[in-house]
């Protein structure tokens, strides 16, 4: 019940453009503890470097990649015309949105408390066959690369971007569709 108030307070206290909070996975086996190995902290992304953030927090899934466990600033979304990509074109459109939003973050606040219960059912989208998964993940990689260039951050992220794309396509894609039926 305090998720929004706590996230807004963290944003105001730290000046963060993004607040990330933890969640619990709920399956038919019950409710798990906090999913993400995060801690309460404030990160100066400008000082740390965005590439370093991706390596230390994004890819090892310390802060997750989901768009729904974050508090965003509307002005950043509107000024940069950020929108979700159509799901038939992109798989993990929330991941793409979150990565694009990070191009505009200078300060990030993380809250370790799991505020959200993420219900994962066997018949949910994540449990179903994902048509054209590889094509949709490749499209995600291309769109992220294009957006990074449009933001003028391509040199800064030159070494991390191929790893991000590989991680999403190969590691996550094969895990989600080990048969590779759509390749």
Descriptions of predicted regions:
Residues 2-112, 116-132:
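Donor-binding/catalytic cores of nucleotide-activated saccharide
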Residues 110, 117-183:
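C-terminal subregions of glycosyltransferases and related glycan-biosynthesis enzymes
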């Amino acid at each position: 019940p305090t998720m929004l108030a706590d996230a807004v307070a963290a944003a105001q206290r730290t000046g963060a453009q993004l607040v990330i909070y933890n969640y619990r996975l709920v399956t038919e086996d019950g409710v798990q503890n906090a999913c993400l190995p995060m801690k309460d902290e404030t990160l100066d992304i400008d000082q740390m470097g965005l590439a370093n953030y991706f390596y230390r927090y994004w890819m090892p899934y310390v802060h997750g990649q989901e768009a729904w466990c974050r508090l965003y600033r509307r002005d950043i979304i509107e000024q940069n015309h950020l929108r979700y990509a159509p799901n038939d074109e992109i798989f993990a459109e929330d991941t793409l949105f979150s990565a694009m939003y990070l191009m505009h973050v200078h300060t990030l606040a993380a809250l370790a408390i799991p505020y959200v219960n993420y219900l994962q059912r066997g018949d949910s989208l994540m449990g179903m066959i994902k048509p054209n998964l590889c094509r949709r993940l490749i499209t995600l990689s291309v769109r992220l690369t294009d957006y990074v260039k449009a933001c003028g951050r391509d040199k800064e992220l030159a070494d991390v971007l191929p790893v991000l794309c590989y991680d999403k396509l190969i590691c996550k894609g094969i895990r989600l569709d080990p048969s590779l039926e759509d390749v």
